[in-house]
Amino acid sequence: MNTPTPSHLDWLSSLTPVGTRASSSDLGATDLGCGRLSAAWEVLSHVLDPEVPAVSLVELGIVRDLVETADGVEVVLTPTYSGCPATEAIEQSVRDALSRFGTVTVTMRRAPAWTTDWITDEGREKLRRYGIAPPGPVDAGQGVPIRIVRRREAIACPRCGSTHTEQLSAFGSTACKSLYRCVACREPFEHFKPI
């Protein structure tokens, strides 16, 4: 990903302005502020998630806002869930990566809560190539029929594509993943839990 595309930044228009903000319409601008913000977005697009190093924080959808301040930049992040053990490492990675932009302030915004729907299409494909089955869509706010026996969504194997898979454990190497096995190719894999 070279620069953030408008699809990554469309939600910015709904946020309250705090300072100079990069928006989808600013990406082509050449003034110093927008150029700095575009450069900062470019840097952030290469900061990898410490628990899933196949995707960047931008692709994961946890970078919510980027604002130019008087002496640097402010980055607003939404953690994947409250209590995520990688939060401090993520904050430090962001500070280190953006240090050339001056003072880096990292703010955690927990509302609205992060959802796997915020993972970009490119991020989902990178998860798949890394061997992690990406999450399906979350239909927040839509009613779900109550069933006595819960039917599981068919999870496609990231290696062979078969949906003939079985869950081995609700818990994988991190709290946001579960462990599966493909019955077709017999390979184990992790599935990023939809939130």
Segments and roles (model prediction):
Residues M1-I195:
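Domain-level signature for proteins that mediate thiol-based redox and metal-cofactor handling
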